[in-house]
Amino acid sequence: MRKYQHLLFSLLSIAFLASCGKSYKDQQRLNREQQIEAARQDSAALKIATVPTMDCLPLFIAAEDSLFQKAGVDVRLKRFGSQTDGDTLLRSKNAEGIVTDLVKAEHLRHQGIALKFVTSTNASWQLISNRIARVAELKQLSDKMVAIAPYSATQMLADMAIDSARTKEKVYRIEINDVNVRLKMILNNEIDAAILPEPQATQARLFQNPVLMDSRDKNLHLGVIAFRQEVMENKDRKQQIKKFLQVYDATVDSINKHGVKHYGKIIRKYMGVDMHTVNALPTMTYHHTTSPRQRDIARGARFTP
């Protein structure tokens, strides 16, 4: 009797293990199918590289409020702390578009990445010094360190500031790609000055760090949204981009109607600043999609690092 019981137990165990094995294989197959489908959807989506700055606000609002989805276009924002990471994604063709500046775009062109500008943006930058460094004017940057992102508008603006100051000693340009790292270096007294966009510039000013130069005073409009040229030549992609720009314009209207502070929670979430910074932001006006000025394109193209 015990012999038969032992045999029955063995058979049941084998059957159980076999069913477990089948279940595990089924789960593996299902996971693979889900991964393949997710990859297919991601490949078909319109992917745009962004950074945590105010020129990206219309995109962040549209994503957060599902406005792209409601317009029937799958837009996926690839969020990075630096333009360089977005460049890498664009270079590997894992993104169709990027929020960038005209200097950076020219650098990408030299690397063989042809871009089409679909709109300019309201991006701006300020050269802000560390109050501990006691740099209150440009000529005091002599023998100081300025944090910039290489091959970008920040490097061009730093060069403009330094050249105009005619300092007695060399000014050292320190390459810090991540915009929030540049901000932290100012706040932690680790750098003498930095080129910062909004909202990082506002946060730096709140800590009494002086502004030495503002790109808005130079009549420079260097911010752009661009897509790879080959993407713009694809019929399906062109339709996606058309819908993207329609949503962009509608979002711009909403921002101008309600003001940027109305979207404080989204600014906090996507840009990593507190409400104190949000409430201190300057008044900003966003514009509908419009091509960048030829003078700004030429200025970006002329810059040689």
What are these model-predicted stretches?
Residues K22-R29, A153-R173, Q246-A280:
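Ligand-binding clefts/hinges and TM-proximal coupling segments of bilobed small-molecule sensing domains
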Residues S23-I176, M185, D192-E198, P210-N219:
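Short, glycine-/small- and polar/acidic-enriched structural segments
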Residues K25-Q34, A38-L46, A193, H262-P305:
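An extracytoplasmic/periplasmic, membrane-proximal ligand-sensing/linker region
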Residues L102-K104, R173-I174, D178-I267:
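Pocket-lining segment of extracytoplasmic ligand-binding domains
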